[in-house]
């Protein structure tokens, strides 16, 4: 439910700002969203005795030099009792920005560490394949092989050592 409402706010934001303003908007939302990690802050925002306008002003005090659009946006969220949606709006606006910039993030899993050179080679190959900028982050896991996941593109490529061994065994048995 929150994601649906957040998408509507993001759509309105994107229709009203240019790319430079969008970067500032995301920066401001990131500052506020970081505050939502603190339990006391969430308690203050959810206090029913505190007026929504006071909550909006409190949130705006966390941001240095907010634009008029940003002030109006936070006041609108406060008036509609939707200030708790700020982290969801930030996540949604970041994903929309990556779509606009044609940048996709993914992960590489394997039972060994990939160095920066190997990661950049994979990024280049996937970038050419999908005609988009691909950024990959590597992590070591228990997966016996290598797996590349690009969630935004809906792509998963993997090479499993166990599967290779099984297929080779089957091929040898068929040949006999």
Curated annotation (Swiss-Prot):
Q: Where in the cell is it found?
A: Cell inner membrane
For the keyword Cell membrane, the answer is yes
Choose one Gene Ontology CC annotation of this protein and give it: proton-transporting ATP synthase complex
SUPFAM superfamilies per the UniProt record, alphabetical: N-terminal domain of the delta subunit of the F1F0-ATP synthase
Q: Which GO terms describe its molecular function?
A: proton-transporting ATP synthase activity, rotational mechanism
Q: Which InterPro entries match?
A: ATP_synth_OSCP/delta_N_sf, ATPase_OSCP/dsu
Main location per the UniProt record: membrane
Short name of any one Pfam family annotated for the protein:
OSCP
The cross-references to Gene3D superfamilies, in alphabetical order and at most eight, read: N-terminal domain of the delta subunit of the F1F0-ATP synthase (1.10.520.20)
Membrane topology, record value: Peripheral membrane protein
Q: Which UniProt keywords apply?
A: ATP synthesis, Cell inner membrane, Cell membrane, CF(1), Hydrogen ion transport, Ion transport, Membrane, Transport
Task: Note the subunit structure.
Answer: F-type ATPases have 2 components, F(1) - the catalytic core - and F(0) - the membrane proton channel. F(1) has five subunits: alpha(3), beta(3), gamma(1), delta(1), epsilon(1). F(0) has three main subunits: a(1), b(2) and c(10-14). The alpha and beta chains form an alternating ring which encloses part of the gamma chain. F(1) is attached to F(0) by a central stalk formed by the gamma and epsilon chains, while a peripheral stalk is formed by the delta and b chains.
What does it do?
Answer: F(1)F(0) ATP synthase produces ATP from ADP in the presence of a proton or sodium gradient. F-type ATPases consist of two structural domains, F(1) containing the extramembraneous catalytic core and F(0) containing the membrane proton channel, linked together by a central stalk and a peripheral stalk. During catalysis, ATP synthesis in the catalytic domain of F(1) is coupled via a rotary mechanism of the central stalk subunits to proton translocation.
Q: Which family does it belong to?
A: Belongs to the ATPase delta chain family.
- Name-wise, this protein is ATP synthase subunit delta
């Amino acid at each position: 439910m929150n994601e649906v409402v957040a998408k509507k706010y993001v759509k309105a934001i994107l229709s009203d700002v240019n790319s430079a303003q969008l970067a500032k908007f995301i920066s401001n939302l990131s500052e506020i969203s970081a505050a939502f990690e603190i339990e006391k802050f969430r308690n203050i925002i959810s206090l029913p005795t505190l007026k929504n306008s006071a909550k909006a002003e409190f949130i705006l005090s966390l941001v240095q030099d907010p634009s008029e659009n940003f002030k109006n946006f936070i006041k609108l969220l406060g008036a509609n009792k939707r200030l708790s949606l700020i982290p969801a709006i930030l996540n949604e606006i970041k994903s929309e920005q990556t779509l606009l910039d044609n940048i996709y993030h993914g992960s590489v899993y394997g039972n060994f560490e990939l160095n920066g050179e190997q990661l950049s080679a994979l990024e280049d190959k996937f970038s050419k394949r999908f005609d988009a900028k691909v950024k990959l982050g590597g992590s070591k896991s228990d997966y016996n092989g290598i797996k590349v996941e690009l969630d935004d593109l809906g792509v998963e490529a993997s090479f499993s050592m166990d599967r290779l061994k099984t297929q080779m065994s089957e091929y040898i048995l068929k040949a006999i």
